[in-house]
Every structure is written in C-alpha cells, then in structure tokens.
C-alpha cells in the first residue's frame, strides 16, 4: 500500500496586512519535533481527508464553519499509521509531548484554510 493520495489543498489564511497567523505560530512557537509532527499530520491526514477528519480522533467541528485538527502523536507514529502494510515495527513514543490544535475552515470543495493554532499542552 502506498502513501495516501492528497485530495485537498492546504492554504494559510492571510490577513489584509499579509500576516499568516497559523504559519507564524508553527514557525515561532513550536519545537522542531512538534513542527515535524504537525507537518506529517497536515500532509498525511488533513490533505487526504479534509473536513472528514471530524469523523475521527483527528478532528472536531467547533461551529460556524470552523473545525480543528487535533494532534497528539509524533511524526514517526503518524508516518507508520499512514502505511499500515509496512513491515516496520510501531515506533516508540518520543519524550516530546505533542498536543496541538489547528483551526481550519473548508473553503470550497477542495481547499482547507489553516487559520491558527495552539499547543494545548502548554496552554490548556
């Protein structure tokens, strides 16, 4: 079984002054392991399932057209889960705690806007 097929385009919301809150949060507030895990989740989960993540542990509708991507796994676990036919053993959880939320909006049928996010582990 190959890697999942991307069905949705992910775009960062950009304000009138050019700020991209989700991108800024990812680049300035997250540790390297958190960024790698989030990048994997965006590629392997959100870009494949879009708003359909809300039917899984990875998403939840929050109202008014918004939903959140919910992440509590590291990059290695996400990659392993995306290739279940892999002969490799399940990776051990790293010591880095991952508990991230990214707020999203489905724009049209194939675009997901990334609006902002927070580290629930640091800011419960």
Where in this protein do the model-derived segments appear?
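Hydrophobic/aromatic beta-strand elements that line small-molecule binding cavities or substrate pockets
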Residues: 101-104
């Amino acid at each position: 079984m190959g890697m999942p097929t991307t069905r949705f385009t992910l775009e960062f919301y950009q304000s009138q002054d050019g700020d991209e809150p989700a991108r800024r949060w990812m680049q300035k507030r997250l540790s390297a392991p958190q960024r790698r895990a989030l990048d994997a989740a965006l590629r392997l989960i959100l870009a494949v399932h879009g708003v359909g993540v809300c039917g899984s542990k990875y998403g939840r509708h929050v109202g008014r057209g918004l939903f959140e991507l919910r992440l509590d796994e590291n990059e290695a676990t996400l990659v392993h889960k995306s290739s279940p036919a892999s002969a490799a053993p399940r990776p051990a959880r790293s010591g880095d705690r991952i508990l991230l939320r990214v707020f999203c909006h489905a724009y049209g049928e194939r675009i997901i806007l990334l609006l902002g996010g927070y580290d629930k582990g640091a800011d419960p």
